[in-house]
Amino acid sequence: MHTREEKLQAFGRILDILDELREKCPWDRKQTNESLRPQTLEEVYELSDAILKGEERELSKELGDVLLHVIFYAKIGEEKQHFDIVDVINFLCDKLIYRHPHVFSTAEVGGAEDVIKQWEMLKTTEKDGNKRVLSGVPDGLPPLLKAYRMQDKARGVGFDWEKKEQVWDKVKEEMGEYQAELDAMAAAQTEDEKAAAYDRAEDELGDFLFATVNAARLYGLNPDTALERTCAKFRRRFTYLEEQTIRKGRNLKDMTLAEMDAIWDEGKAKGL
């Protein structure tokens, strides 16, 4: 692998390249924080895909794209005389040192769980830091990830089930309430009744999903990763179903559910 000097040279190289692009390229020159934001989200999702697929070469490329965006935002901040890349890095370094007193000072921790609790506690005491436990969870996060992060933040200050097994009563309770509202929605007569029942059912569905996320978290599972794996599995099997149907000269719309299930089970048996 590369030496520290080579790493610093590479970092200096990208800084020089971006300086030149910002000055001489019409597209790069007109970019703003706002115009870059959707592209940044896309790059992060592409990075996530590379991680999930275990493609190391692709991971290296996608990390570079994300790094470019970090440096780009810092360059824009520098042009506005608000901050530059040195401020960004120093702020990060100071934060890491402050939040790891068990590494850089004399504090002691018993394990990873204590580190997380210490991290959350220190965040609330920082100057200009997040003074509320949940203020560090962005509103723009996807709902599943947001639920997980909110629950994890609350856990960091002790707001959690005493025993993980207790969560199942809550899951069953929320599932029952959701089913009851679905029944009420089916029995509704007027449009107003249907609208009100739909709203209540949606609310209870949210509670049920939130409780399910909690159950996953308490057992050390990441629901976002789990659902991503299931989506990938569904894609593989459905693609197999489509391909086999085409090979037979048929169309999915013309097949019975039993016929599709049979091909689906074939794909499942093949480990797809």
Briefly describe each language-model feature range.
Residues 1-62, 68-205, 210-272:
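Flexible "arm" and connector segments at domain edges
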